Amino acid sequence: MMNTAEFKVIFNQYDELDTLLLEAITQLKIDISAEQRRKLLLYLDKLLFWNKAYNLTAIKQPKEALIKHVIDCLAILPHLKPGKLLDIGTGAGLPGVIVAICEPERPITVLDSNQKKIRFIRQSISELQVTNVTPVASRIENFNPDEGDKFAVVTSRAFASLTDFVEAAAPRLAQGGWLQAMKGLIPEPQELQVLQDQWQIDNIALSVPYLHETRHLTELHKIVI
């Protein structure tokens, strides 16, 4: 049995949540070790613990938070393009920290203008010994990497508008890179039409275990003429 002494919030629900997480991982057909699973649950525990002071999420119930935050982010893993990743508007680290735990070889930068949320991420990844994440407290317009430091993949689940996401993300994208936005419904046709002259757009339907809501990953690749 797992030693749950390091858990502050979910210790009395650990076995139930671990079983749920393992079943979700099996359904998603992703390869995650027992140690990575423990780190995902520790991240969830820290999210709920820090939430009392830092207002990181409106979701306070551990099972609901596991499904709507952790498992929701895990569902994109089979579809993520390879390479260095930037997560814009990461909030408490979603999906960036979740991806980092599961893909320790991938360099990931998580960016948010909210200092408290970045402070939470810094503390959490230090305690979890997640070494492939660089947290940045900045507005996106003030984050301008040099050409050689741009990103192969830019993700976000924070933008309601796909055009706003593209406007923010495209200048930080390396040549040949991919934009991948976590969405509920497929973006409206008029929004897609604005972008289709410059971007190849695909909408991937996601099946998120235990989440009875529509989810899509909208990916965009620059059209080279």
Swiss-Prot record:
Pfam families: GidB (PF02527). The keyword Cytoplasm applies. It is found in: Cytoplasm. This is Ribosomal RNA small subunit methyltransferase G. Coiled coil: none annotated. Its EC number is 2.1.1.170. Its main location: cytoplasm. It comes from the Bacteria. InterPro entries: rRNA_ssu_MeTfrase_G (IPR003682), SAM-dependent_MTases_sf (IPR029063). S-adenosyl-L-methionine binds at G89, L94, I140, E141, R157. It catalyses: guanosine(527) in 16S rRNA + S-adenosyl-L-methionine = N(7)-methylguanosine(527) in 16S rRNA + S-adenosyl-L-homocysteine. CDD domains: AdoMet_MTases. Keywords: Cytoplasm, Methyltransferase, rRNA processing, S-adenosyl-L-methionine, Transferase. GO terms for cellular component: cytosol. GO terms for molecular function: rRNA (guanine-N7-)-methyltransferase activity. The keyword S-adenosyl-L-methionine applies. It is an enzyme of class 2 (transferase). Specifically methylates the N7 position of guanine in position 527 of 16S rRNA. Belongs to the methyltransferase superfamily. RNA methyltransferase RsmG family.
